[in-house]
Amino acid sequence: MASRRRMLLKVIILGDSGVGKTSLMNQYVNRKFSNQYKATIGADFLTKEVQFEDRLFTLQIWDTAGQERFQSLGVAFYRGADCCVLVYDVNVMKSFENLNNWREEFLIQATPSDPENFPFVVLGNKIDVDGGNSRVVSEKKAKAWCASKGNIPYFETSAKEGFNVDDAFQCIAKNALNNEPEEEIYLPDTIDVAGGGRQQRSSGCEC
């Protein structure tokens, strides 16, 4: 049987400070939520092993600072990304209005080989706040924006409750995998000398 190699896929999460980027990443990777997160300084990342159709790969998720003073660091962190996630708070109109700025900044600094077809995914977060009564950005408005940018996949999430987080990241992983060029980057795999099977962490998604 052919050996299974683990491929590295890089995902960047962008959005205004306070929209829940760190919370979403930690909910997906660690199944944890905290109200005590401090603003990300520069950038940080977590990894998660995922599997699609008998292929193992490591999803490297970069959580970047939303403050303007850190945006100059973008070039170093954005380049080599396989998918970009744009996050806004459904209760803060300005965070939604800034999505276009984040998208344009990524395309300028990351310089993808095919910018018109580079995969983005949009997450409208914090739908749990005040039972939805504080919401100012409608799902219809968000979907219309996504459609105008080439039908970007859209998910509404609650990092606090874990709602839709797995489905969103499965779609993100699938888009990242589909964008991976021919010259794939592989991580060294371990040899199972005992002949046992490898644990499967996650299943494929439909997106």
UniProtKB/Swiss-Prot annotation:
The modification Cysteine methyl ester is found at C207. Its main location: membrane. GTP binds at residues 15-22, 63-67, 125-128. One of its GO terms (biological process) is protein transport. It is found in: Cell membrane. A lipid is attached at C205, C207 (S-geranylgeranyl cysteine). It is a lipid-anchor. One of its GO terms (molecular function) is GTPase activity. This is Ras-related protein Rab7. The lineage of its organism: Eukaryota, Viridiplantae, Streptophyta, Embryophyta, Tracheophyta.
